[in-house]
């Protein structure tokens, strides 16, 4: 039978029962301990030694712990793995407390509420999101506890809510206790931690933060979010800004999968930031500027006036090189004001943080002067909005030591001269030893006792020791006996008692007074949080603008011209990231010419020729333009796109194994159902995931639907070359192709997009690039020559069947109709530009002809280079 729990373990269990889904870090002296299941799992995750509090087999309690000074490092590890950690502190001094020390949880750290962000995480937002369902959709609120940002919106359905969660990269979602099973399933699939909050707490704070909201549902979801924060953090949320409502319809919509396909923030190959548009554009000098750039990238604007305003500012900094250089030099000295303000309000700021805050504020007058020298209207309002907070900077300068320690409780934080009493304490501490030495010499002279000495012990404190042979020399009225030894007596004097009290109490009193003064300084700064946050927002915006100006100069970007008549004219456009990686190699620019009468470009050409790059570069150009950034082109005129849809597979050298025909159709359907005439659609080889006839029929039907019903600007790449005949049937479709040529029998990709369809597939050349055996390639050429001879006699004068009945597609929504046009259904005629023809050949050699048939039937144009290499490897093994 297990023995009864100790009082301490009973206390531990009571606290643990309140936080069953969190690791409980229970303070015991200089360590935070974990027990039972927390200890077993924590030891594994944190690589700690698992021990036992009781050595009894019948009552063994697993235990492990971490030093209190290193606790943040261990908490961060658990948070990064998606867990919660409850910090249980000692609320009383064990040295002065009789019985059990009172303990309670002072904060609950979760993936969505962590404040200690360093490294790459410092340049990213950490959003905690709340979801609350209502009739007709969801209300969604999110906050970054480290910066104080608080926003709220409304989405129409669960899919839109999940898309917004993924776009926000939220790691934790707060819901009411009862939610739909499908929502829980979606959160689980995406490794998003779900937390629950029932009762709304602190109505006054909730009311303050939601006072600008007119929608009751949005106020409710903000209340849910703020209540969770108050419950878990157990401290003031004074730095949270009043909730700002936004509408997704105010920004260009790009769903998460399209963002992934376009590599806006995450590289498809590495999963990292390098090689993305965000990586290319991020020439910001501050962490808050980097976070704002990511927000602008996530939400390109639709308001032309706001976009042009950003263009004007970029242009001014682009035109003033030296001012821009000076501005960059000052911005580098600005620390993360948003998160510094958050730590001030949160009560976690230290002396070094305040020095960083002061250093940042000292740069503001210099930045204002630089903007004043520009003397242009574009920066007038921004310059005037930059508040240097001289009162705050002055207070920190007077109060805080230039190089304070990290700890605020061990002394050394307050500057000398700030407080007279503190200076006295410090003087006593620093001069105590010298004063004792001087007193000893003074007493020797006064008494004539040369071996008189002053000593100290913990029992009696400071004392004057005199040998018994010299006792008679002491004046009776000044010396008070404290201790008698065998050969000596120890005494005290009024002066020694007075100094003893000052010296012994100086350290404790100094430390306590320093902390009291520091808290007063911190609270004084806290009162200016609103001003600090506004300054941070303005400096972040200025930082992003200078970054745009720098990349515009470095990469020869130009200011685009925006229009509302669907004119898309890009001269010498480039893919900015590909161009950067090519280094000294010359990137081949391409035009995108789609007037008001052209809505679809049908793109043909061999694999590896650059079709996907051409499509992506247009989308990136549109995103950059509506961010307020200049674009990679010689000249660019663009409409304002309301949405971008993509159906583009993974990069050509990836084999993800995730792209199924169903996913392809679902993504295509998303575009067809939601696109408008103001949207941009990129369809890359639609239909390749199924049989040839099915794929071709679907591809043609999709083209017709977009042409007749949607009217969006669309780039549609295909290997179904029969579809190029649609140019003669659909008024708003134009053929273009990515060229290639042969030089000395070698295939050369031109990477140049020109009008008209591709006239040759170069399939065998691509096979050669993939490393196929020379005998195989020779045989394939023989077969191809034979088949081309047969085709010459068999090819009809047209590649499209006579007209056949066409089922009218059901429109996704009522729009201004485009003239309805249908075309005959295409067939897989002998005129198709296949990689290898499919006609039978006479068998001459069993193994060779079997291999030739396999080569002939290989649909190389729909395969990646990796697919080809794997197949060639199998053939090589069979030939051995």
UniProtKB/Swiss-Prot annotation:
The lineage of its organism: Bacteria, Bacillati, Bacillota, Bacilli, Lactobacillales. Residues 790-829 are annotated as: Disordered. ATP binds at residues 605-612. One of its GO terms (cellular component) is cytosol. NCBIfam families: mutS1 (TIGR01070), PRK05399.1 (NF003810). This is DNA mismatch repair protein MutS. Gene3D superfamilies: 1.10.1420.10, DNA repair protein MutS, domain I, MutS, connector domain, P-loop containing nucleotide triphosphate hydrolases. Keywords: ATP-binding, DNA damage, DNA repair, DNA-binding, Nucleotide-binding. PROSITE patterns: DNA_MISMATCH_REPAIR_2. Belongs to the DNA mismatch repair MutS family. It comes from the Bacteria. Residues 818-829 have a biased composition (Polar residues). The keyword Transferase does not apply. This protein is involved in the repair of mismatches in DNA. It is possible that it carries out the mismatch recognition step. This protein has a weak ATPase activity. It comes from Limosilactobacillus fermentum (strain NBRC 3956 / LMG 18251) (Lactobacillus fermentum). CDD domains: ABC_MutS1. Pfam families: MutS_I, MutS_II, MutS_III, MutS_IV, MutS_V. InterPro entries: DNA_mismatch_repair_MutS (IPR005748), DNA_mismatch_repair_MutS-lik_N (IPR007695), DNA_mismatch_repair_MutS/MSH (IPR017261), DNA_mismatch_repair_MutS_C (IPR000432), DNA_mismatch_repair_MutS_clamp (IPR007861), DNA_mismatch_repair_MutS_core (IPR007696), DNA_mismatch_repair_MutS_N (IPR016151), DNA_mismatch_repair_MutS_sf (IPR036187). SUPFAM superfamilies: DNA repair protein MutS, domain I (SSF55271), DNA repair protein MutS, domain II (SSF53150), DNA repair protein MutS, domain III (SSF48334), P-loop containing nucleoside triphosphate hydrolases (SSF52540). GO terms for biological process: mismatch repair. One of its GO terms (molecular function) is damaged DNA binding.
């Amino acid at each position: 039978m297990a023995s009864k729990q100790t009082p301490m373990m009973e206390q531990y269990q009571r606290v643990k029962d309140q936080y069953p889904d969190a690791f409980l870090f229970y303070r015991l002296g200089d360590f935070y301990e974990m027990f039972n299941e927390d200890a077993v799992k924590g030891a594994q995750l944190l690589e700690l030694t698992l021990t036992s509090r009781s050595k009894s087999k019948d009552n063994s309690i697993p235990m492990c712990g971490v030093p209190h000074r290193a606790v943040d490092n261990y908490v961060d590890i658990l948070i990064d793995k998606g867990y919660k950690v409850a910090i249980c502190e000692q609320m009383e001094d064990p040295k002065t407390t009789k019985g059990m020390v009172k303990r309670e949880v002072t904060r609950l750290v979760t993936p969505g509420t962590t404040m200690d962000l360093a490294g790459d995480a410092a340049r990213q937002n950490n959003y905690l999101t709340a979801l609350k369902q209502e009739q007709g959709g969801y209300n969604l609120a999110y906050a970054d506890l480290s910066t104080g940002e608080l926003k709220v919106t409304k989405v129409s359905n669960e899919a839109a809510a999940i898309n917004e969660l993924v776009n926000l990269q939220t790691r934790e979602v707060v819901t009411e206790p009862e939610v739909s099973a499908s929502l829980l399933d979606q959160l689980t699939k995406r490794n998003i931690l779900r937390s629950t909050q029932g009762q709304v707490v602190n109505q006054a704070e909730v009311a303050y933060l939601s006072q600008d909201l007119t929608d009751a549902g949005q106020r409710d979801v903000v209340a849910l979010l703020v209540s969770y924060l108050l419950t878990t953090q157990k401290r003031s949320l004074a730095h949270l800004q009043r909730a700002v409502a936004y509408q997704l319809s105010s920004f260009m919509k790009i769903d998460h999968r399209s963002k992934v396909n376009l590599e806006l923030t995450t590289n498809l190959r590495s999963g990292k930031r390098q090689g993305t548009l965000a990586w290319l554009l991020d020439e910001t000098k501050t962490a808050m500027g980097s976070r704002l750039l990511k927000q602008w990238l996530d939400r390109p604007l639709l308001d032309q006036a706001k976009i042009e305003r950003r263009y004007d500012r970029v242009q001014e900094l682009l035109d003033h090189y030296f001012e821009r250089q000076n501005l960059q030099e000052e911005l580098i000295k600005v620390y993360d004001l948003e998160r510094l303000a958050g730590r001030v309000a949160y009560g976690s700021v230290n002396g070094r943080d305040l020095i960083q805050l002061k250093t940042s504020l000292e740069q503001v007058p210099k930045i204002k002067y630089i903007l004043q020298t520009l003397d242009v209207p574009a920066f007038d309002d921004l310059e005037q909005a930059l508040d240097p907070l001289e009162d705050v900077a002055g207070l920190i300068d007077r109060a805080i030591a230039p190089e304070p320690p990290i700890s605020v409780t061990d002394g050394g934080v307050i500057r000398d001269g700030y407080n007279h009493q503190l200076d006295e304490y410090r003087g006593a501490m620093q001069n105590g030893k010298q004063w004792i030495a001087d007193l000893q010499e003074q007493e020797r002279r006064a008494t004539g006792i040369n071996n008189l000495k002053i000593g100290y012990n913990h029992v009696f404190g400071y004392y004057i020791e005199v040998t018994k042979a010299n006792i008679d020399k002491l004046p009776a009225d000044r010396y008070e006996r404290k201790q008698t030894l065998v050969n000596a007596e120890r005494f005290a004097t009024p002066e020694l008692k007075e100094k003893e009290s000052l010296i012994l109490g100086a350290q404790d009193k100094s430390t306590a007074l320093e902390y009291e003064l520091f808290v007063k300084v911190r609270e004084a700064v806290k009162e200016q949080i609103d001003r600090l946050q506004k300054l941070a927002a303005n400096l972040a915006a200025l930082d992003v603008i200078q970054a745009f100006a720098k990349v515009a100069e470095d990469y020869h970007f130009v200011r685009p011209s925006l229009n509302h008549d669907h004119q898309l004219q890009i001269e010498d456009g480039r893919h900015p990231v590909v161009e950067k990686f090519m280094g000294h190699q010359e990137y081949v620019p391409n035009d995108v010419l789609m007037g008001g009468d052209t809505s679809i470009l049908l793109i043909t050409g061999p694999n590896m020729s650059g079709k996907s790059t051409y499509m992506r570069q247009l989308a990136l150009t549109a995103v950059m333009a509506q961010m307020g950034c200049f674009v990679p082109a010689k000249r660019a005129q663009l409409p304002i796109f309301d949405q971008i849809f993509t159906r583009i597979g993974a990069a050509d050298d990836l084999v993800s194994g995730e792209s199924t025909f169903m996913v392809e159709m679902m993504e295509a359907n998303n575009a067809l159902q939601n696109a408008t005439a103001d949207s941009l659609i990129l369809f890359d080889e639609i239909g390749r995931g199924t049989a040839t006839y099915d794929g071709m029929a679907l591809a043609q039907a999709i083209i017709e639907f977009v042409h007749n019903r949607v009217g969006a600007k669309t780039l549609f790449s295909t290997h179904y070359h029969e579809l190029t005949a649609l140019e003669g049937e659909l008024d708003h479709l134009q053929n273009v192709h990515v060229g290639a040529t042969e030089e000395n029998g070698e295939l050369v990709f031109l990477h140049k997009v020109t009008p008209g369809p591709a006239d040759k597939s170069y399939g065998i050349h691509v096979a050669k690039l993939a490393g196929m055996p020379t005998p195989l390639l020779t045989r394939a050429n023989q077969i191809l020559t034979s088949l081309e001879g047969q085709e010459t006699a068999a090819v009809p004068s047209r590649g499209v069947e006579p007209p056949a009945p066409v089922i009218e597609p059901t429109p996704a929504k009522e729009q201004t109709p485009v003239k309805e046009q249908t075309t005959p259904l295409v067939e897989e005629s002998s005129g198709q530009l296949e990689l290898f023809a499919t006609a039978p050949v006479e068998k001459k050699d069993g193994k060779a002809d079997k291999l030739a048939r396999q080569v002939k039937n290989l649909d190389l144009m729909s395969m990646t280079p990796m697919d080809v290499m794997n197949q060639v490897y199998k053939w090589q093994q069979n030939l051995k």
